[in-house]
Every structure is written in C-alpha cells, then in structure tokens.
Regions:
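Helix-termini ("caps") and immediately adjacent flexible loops/tails
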Residues: 2, 13, 30-32
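SAM-dependent methyltransferases
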Residues: 1-2, 23, 46, 143-145
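C-terminal binding/interaction regions
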Residues: 4-6, 10, 86-145
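A short beta-strand-loop structural module common to alpha/beta enzyme folds
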Residues: 28-39
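Glycine-rich phosphate/diphosphate-binding loop of Rossmann-like nucleotide-binding domains
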Residues: 4-25
Length: 145
C-alpha cells in the first residue's frame, strides 16, 4: 500500500519510528516532511495527495493528532479520523472509509501507535447498507461545497 505521512516538528522522531515500522510491514511510505511549524500546511498537502489518488492512505502526526485531523479534513475528499484505540482505528476504515488517520505523539505511546497503524492498514472498506449510506451522505455534502 502507498502511504503518505507528515507531521509537525514536535512529532518528527515519532514519525520516523513509525515510518520504519510501516516500511517493515511492506508498505511504500512517502514522507511529506515536518519542517513547517504550521502543521496545517503538511496536513493539507498529505490530504491533497491522498484525495487525488496518488496514495492509498495517509497517516499524520502532531502532539494530539487533533490539529492535523482538522486541517486534513478541510481538503475535499478527505475523511480523517484521530484514533487512540484499536477499535476506533479499525472502524475508521470499516465503517467510515477514512483515508487518513491521525495520531498524537504526546498522548499515544509508540507501541500503541504501531497497533493502531496496523489495525487501520489491515482493514479494507467494503460498501454495505448500514455504513455505506452514512459515508455517501458525507461525500454528498463534501461534493456540494
């Protein structure tokens, strides 16, 4: 799977460890950097790349994961979720067809982050009657703006 990643400067070491982990799982990972202190810039860049179909998924990092989630969700076609437990990481994919997850380097330890990333990347969204209509409604709103 092709994965786009990025972070703010505070999460650089965290991101590097998790890039190594994702590559070890066999994923092709492209790093969009961490130099810009305005995390919205890297989050929207990753969002644009994922929404354009250049990458299968995205993973973003900042202190809490909330800021990069908010910024990425401003990009048309992005459905980003901040995840902090394995169930939510799986459901982000299975129920919500999220194409980006976000994690907080200051609130999620390295081992848990690896579990969350694996849970998310191991899932495939399959349209179904229950969740599909909800995702369609989100996409309809997104396409209307």
């Amino acid at each position: 799977m092709k994965i786009a990643v990025g972070c703010d400067p505070n999460a650089e070491a965290y991101k590097q460890e998790l890039i190594t982990y994702m590559r070890g799982l066999g994923h092709e990972v492209t790093d969009f950097g961490s130099e810009d202190v305005i995390y919205a810039h890297v989050a929207t860049k990753v969002g644009e790349e994922v929404a354009a179909g250049h990458f299968d998924r995205g993973v973003l990092f900042c202190g809490t994961g909330i800021g990069v989630m908010l910024a990425a969700n401003k990009v048309k076609g992005v459905r980003a979720a901040n995840v902090n437990n394995v169930y939510s990481a799986k459901r982000a994919c299975l129920s919500n067809d999220c194409n980006i997850i976000t994690l907080g380097s200051q609130v999620t330890g390295d081992m848990l982050a690896k579990e969350l990333i694996s849970a998310y990347l191991d899932c495939t969204y399959v349209y179904n009657e229950r969740s599909g209509k909800k995702v369609d409604a989100i996409n309809d709103y997104d396409n209307a703006r």
